[in-house]
């Protein structure tokens, strides 16, 4: 009895731009499927569009994959390094009669399509150069370089059981004889994909449903080569909050922009996973749980809707749950970028003070500057509003009593309560002036916690300077 064939999946982006959210989600599903089945996840860079492909886009794809924790088991492989292999397969297909040279000019092909439209038929190449038994082909036009077309079956049906959509079928007579090599000999996208999937032993292909129309053509080429046909799954697109196709007008679509904006990769993986896949009513789960639970049966057949508020909620959960020391390591570079002191020994404590109300690391870094940036006194308007003569008198009393007080949250809280009772004040009448006096802000976390982290000497020094 032979052992089952190991699962092999792939992600095959074109480096003509940065990795967008839809591509990242497709990669995530392919990666999780391979991990779930203890298979192999392959990264392939489809860079045959030489004019539009850039090294910067390749690096952005690699950086995005690394940030999301989707390291490939094999690759990256580059199509431009496989041109000799494509040429070899093209020649074998010409020799086998499954491909042929076509000398029709683009203008002639367009005329064929127009004629088909006029007849009410589907616009297509009419097979002028398609060799058939007993058929006489036209004379080869002088000086014209041919394309190579695949000799697609003209009858029957090409069908597959899609892992997401279910049964899908196309009548072969609806499929054109696809161009698989251009006049200069360079192979086309659909041909390269087929050869790559064949050579790399792909067993399952999960990709966007914009590829559905390519699939019957690719299946027929694979069959002509005598290759195994992978199982295909086509996931619906991601829509913006307005129900339109997700685009830049909805905000960031480049994955690494979310890193810049302070989203955790763990949160992004969680959110992307739930965008078109579900496991019961579970909203929050670890990467390990996602891999353990993932299966294609629970991929949605309907488009998903991008919800920035939901992403913020997920990110806030991961920030709250993260160890303060780990959080400090992740936020430190953002503090340094703002010119703050990211080397403070109490940075983890600062994270603990702010993280329960932070939705992003950027917000957390902004909050942390309260302690990590040089002190700036309150703006005049804020000082006028809150540092009244009565408030200054209360602050002077607090400062005098604080000089001999142990500097803990409990002791400071008790001191504030004692001052309130002694002066007949309510909490805001002392707490807000204290905040404004020692932080320059009217709103901060709990005032006793802020005072502890600032340190007794700093607090008394700032009060002395004010009074």
From Swiss-Prot:
Keywords: Aminoacyl-tRNA synthetase, ATP-binding, Cytoplasm, Ligase, Nucleotide-binding, Protein biosynthesis. One of its GO terms (molecular function) is tRNA binding. It catalyses: tRNA(Glu) + L-glutamate + ATP = L-glutamyl-tRNA(Glu) + AMP + diphosphate. Residues 118-141 are annotated as: Disordered. It comes from Bordetella avium (strain 197N). One of its GO terms (cellular component) is cytosol. Catalyzes the attachment of glutamate to tRNA(Glu) in a two-step reaction: glutamate is first activated by ATP to form Glu-AMP and then transferred to the acceptor end of tRNA(Glu). This is Glutamate--tRNA ligase. Its EC number is 6.1.1.17. It comes from the Bacteria.
């Amino acid at each position: 009895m032979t052992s089952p064939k190991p699962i092999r999946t792939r992600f095959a982006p074109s480096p003509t731009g940065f990795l967008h959210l839809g591509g990242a989600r497709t990669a995530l599903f392919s990666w999780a499927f391979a991990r779930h089945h203890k298979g192999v996840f392959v990264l392939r860079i489809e860079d045959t569009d030489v004019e539009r492909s850039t090294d910067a886009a390749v690096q952005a794809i690699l950086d995005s994959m690394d940030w999301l924790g989707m390291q490939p088991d094999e690759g990256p492989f580059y199509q431009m390094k496989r041109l000799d292999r494509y040429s070899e397969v093209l020649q074998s297909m010409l020799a086998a009669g499954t491909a042929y040279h076509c000398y029709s000019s683009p203008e002639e092909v367009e005329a064929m399509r127009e004629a088909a439209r006029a007849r009410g038929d589907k616009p297509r190449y009419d097979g002028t150069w398609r060799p058939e038994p007993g058929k006489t082909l036209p004379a080869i036009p002088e000086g014209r370089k041919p394309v190579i077309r695949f000799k697609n079956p003209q009858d029957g049906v090409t069908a597959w059981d899609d892992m997401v959509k279910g049964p899908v079928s196309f009548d072969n007579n609806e499929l054109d004889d696809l161009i698989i090599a251009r006049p200069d000999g360079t192979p086309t996208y659909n041909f390269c994909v087929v050869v790559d999937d064949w050579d790399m032993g792909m067993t399952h292909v999960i990709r966007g449903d914009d590829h559905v129309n390519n699939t019957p053509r690719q299946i027929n080429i694979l069959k002509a080569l005598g290759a195994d046909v992978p199982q295909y799954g086509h996931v619906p697109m991601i829509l913006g909050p307005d129900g339109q196709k997700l685009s830049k007008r909805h905000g960031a679509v480049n994955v690494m922009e979310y890193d810049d904006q302070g989203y955790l990769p763990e949160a992004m993986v969680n959110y992307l996973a739930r965008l078109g896949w579900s496991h019961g009513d579970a909203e929050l789960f670890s990467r390990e749980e996602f891999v353990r639970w993932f299966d294609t049966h629970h991929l949605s057949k309907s488009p998903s809707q991008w919800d920035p508020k939901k992403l913020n909620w997920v990110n806030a959960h991961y920030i709250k749950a993260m160890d303060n020391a780990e959080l400090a390591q992740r936020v430190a570079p953002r503090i340094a970028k703002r010119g703050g002191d990211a080397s403070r020994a109490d940075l983890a404590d600062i994270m603990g003070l702010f993280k329960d109300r932070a939705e992003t690391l950027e917000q957390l870094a902004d909050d942390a500057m309260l302690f990590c940036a040089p002190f700036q006194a309150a703006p005049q308007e804020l000082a006028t509003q809150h540092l009244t003569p009565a408030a200054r008198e209360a602050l002077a009393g607090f400062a005098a009593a604080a000089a001999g007080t142990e500097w803990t949250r409990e002791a400071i809280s008790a001191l504030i309560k004692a001052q309130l009772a002694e002066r007949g004040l309510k909490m805001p009448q002392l707490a807000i002036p204290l905040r404004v006096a020692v932080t320059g802000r009217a709103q901060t976390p709990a005032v006793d916690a802020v005072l502890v982290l600032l340190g007794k000497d700093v607090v008394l020094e700032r009060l002395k300077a004010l009074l």
